[in-house]
Design a protein with these regions (language model features):
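Structured catalytic-domain cores with a bias toward divalent-metal coordination
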Residues: 5, 14-18, 35-367
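Bacterial N-terminal signal peptides
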Residues: 22-33
Length: 367
């Protein structure tokens, strides 16, 4: 057994046995349990150990109005990695997107995941249960218009504040899911909001392409003031997190093709982010839009659309007409610009300020 030998320069060297003994001594003094270990990940009342899945609630406390609980799921992957937030149901009758995120709860296996996934499948429970489109019926506010929220505000503002602190501030990436509400006949599309920050924009563009929706709006004028970001994705983007918005489903229907589109897009995006094994399936030649133009009703009446979602229209083309309550035609609605009908009002009911249609204006050069 050689513990020490003399080196060529006259010094002494540790022999292999002594080196082995030293390693053993270090092991005794510093056992593996003393090394940094991955911890449980907790959001609200959901706490998942490594390799586990947990459900719970974000508990929004009572304030000027009632308290509410928002369902939350934490999937803490078996391998280390990034944190991804998947959030839907800000508008509780955009059902296809809600069902898609709910389906992901069971599909995502923590054993396959690198990193952590936080899912909020249904932010606006009151809207969902009472079948009220667009707003939270408790305070009549959209749950995607009051970010970053207020700790002492109304229920929508308090919920937005909690989501910002508990999820947005802790995630690396975020996907915000929406779709066609009760009155919106919508064709699937996504939003990509470049910031001018090369690294962040590169990742968010990779995400939106990996998701696979073939129509993408370039949103360049998202709010950037951290205290008034308004939208969920703007709140995340302004804080340096790569984020996208995806839209699928029309007029509150739950079409399996729309649900599958959102589910498969999420899995592909997770592969692009190296959070799931396998290769993403990015869309290769999407249609890019430089802006959207809303067509707004000037007064009430009964709406008769003449075009469908996804139709390409020329400026001046008739989109539909409006009658009074006696059947008399009182106005015709024409396209103010040329572009694609991303969604069109799906129901006859009409009041002043309603949106007849949303037209996407195609870019001259893809980004």
């Amino acid at each position: 057994m050689l513990l020490v030998s003399q080196g060529a320069n006259g010094g002494f060297m540790l022999g292999p046995s002594l080196r082995a003994f030293g390693a053993y001594l270090i092991f005794l003094l510093f056992p593996l349990s003393a090394l940094p270990q991955r911890q449980s990940f907790t959001v609200g009342t959901a706490s998942a150990a490594v390799g586990e899945k947990s459900t719970g609630y974000l508990e929004v406390p009572a304030g000027v109005d009632a308290a509410t609980d928002i369902p939350v799921i934490v999937i803490n992957g078996a391998k280390p990695g990034s944190v991804l937030a998947l959030i839907s149901g800000a508008h509780g009758t955009e059902y296809a997107s809600i069902i898609a995120v709910e389906r992901l709860i069971t599909l995502l296996d923590p054993a396959q995941i690198s990193g952590t996934v936080i899912l909020l499948p249904l932010v606006n429970i009151q809207s969902f249960e009472q079948k009220v489109p667009h707003v939270n019926p408790v305070d009549n506010k959209s749950m995607n218009r009051f970010y970053p929220g207020k700790a002492d505000g109304t229920q929508t503002e308090r919920a937005s504040f909690l989501i910002t602190k508990q999820i947005v501030d802790r995630c690396d990436y975020l996907i915000d899911y929406h779709g066609g509400d009760l009155d919106e006949s919508l064709r699937p599309y996504a939003y990509w909001a470049p910031t001018g920050k090369e690294a962040q924009d590169r990742v968010s563009k990779e995400m939106v392409l990996a998701f696979g929706l073939d129509h993408i709006i370039i949103w360049r004028d998202r709010p950037t003031d951290l205290g008034a970001t308004r939208y969920l994705d703007s709140t995340s983007t302004a804080r340096g997190k790569a984020s996208i918005v995806v839209e699928g489903g029309y007029a509150s229907t739950v079409d399996e093709d729309d649900v599958a589109l959102l589910v498969n897009g999420t899995l592909s995006t997770m592969r692009a982010l190296k959070m799931l094994p396998g290769d993403p399936r990015p869309i290769e030649n999407p249609v890019w839009f430089e802006k959207t133009v809303d067509v707004i009703a000037e007064g009430p009446g009964i709406w008769y659309p003449l075009v469908r979602r996804g139709t390409y229209v020329q400026e001046g083309m008739k989109l539909g007409y409006v009658t009074d309550y006696f059947g008399k035609r009182i106005s015709e609605v024409r396209a103010p610009v040329s572009g694609v009908i991303l969604h069109i009002n799906a129901i006859p009911s009409l009041k002043k300020g309603d949106n007849f249609a949303d037209i996407g204006v195609v870019v001259s050069h893809a980004p």
